Curated annotation (Swiss-Prot):
InterPro entries: Kunitz_BPTI (IPR002223), Kunitz_BPTI_sf (IPR036880), Prtase_inh_Kunz-CS (IPR020901), TFPI/VKTCI-like (IPR050098). Keywords: Disulfide bond, Protease inhibitor, Secreted, Serine protease inhibitor, Signal, Toxin. Negative results: does not inhibit serine proteases (elastase, kallikrein, and pepsin), cysteine protease (cathepsin G), and MMP (1, 3, 7, 8, 9, 10, 12, 13, and 14), as well as voltage-gated potassium channels (Shaker and rKv1.1/KCNA1). Disulfide bonds join C31-C81, C40-C64, C56-C77. PANTHER family: KUNITZ-TYPE PROTEASE INHIBITOR-RELATED. It comes from Pseudechis rossignolii (Papuan pigmy mulga snake). This is Kunitz serine protease inhibitor Pr-mulgin 2. Residues 31-81 form the BPTI/Kunitz inhibitor domain.
């Protein structure tokens, strides 16, 4: 195979890897934790990954404690857990 063909193949494989969804075993463990608003009484929009629905959902975060399945934006949640 020519060097141009090898470069094309390498590029296609790289693209394929970027487009392939993350399997549940490759997701960070905290993506499987339930959403946790924490004990504080704040009212902050946040997002968490719902592993059964396999999507990110909105919830109200109290502002303290909680757990790592807590994202400021839906895009951050999707990049981390639903990609």
């Amino acid at each position: 195979m020519s060097s141009g063909g090898l470069l094309l193949l390498l590029g296609l494989l790289t693209l394929w890897e970027g487009l392939t969804p993350v399997s549940s075993k490759d997701r960070p463990h905290f993506c499987h934790l339930p959403h946790d608003p924490g004990p504080c009484k704040g009212n902050f929009q946040a997002f968490y990954y719902h592993p059964v629905r396999r999507t990110c959902l909105e919830f109200i975060y109290g502002g303290c404690q909680g757990n790592p399945n807590n994202f400021k934006t839906i895009d951050e949640c999707k990049r981390t857990c639903a990609a």
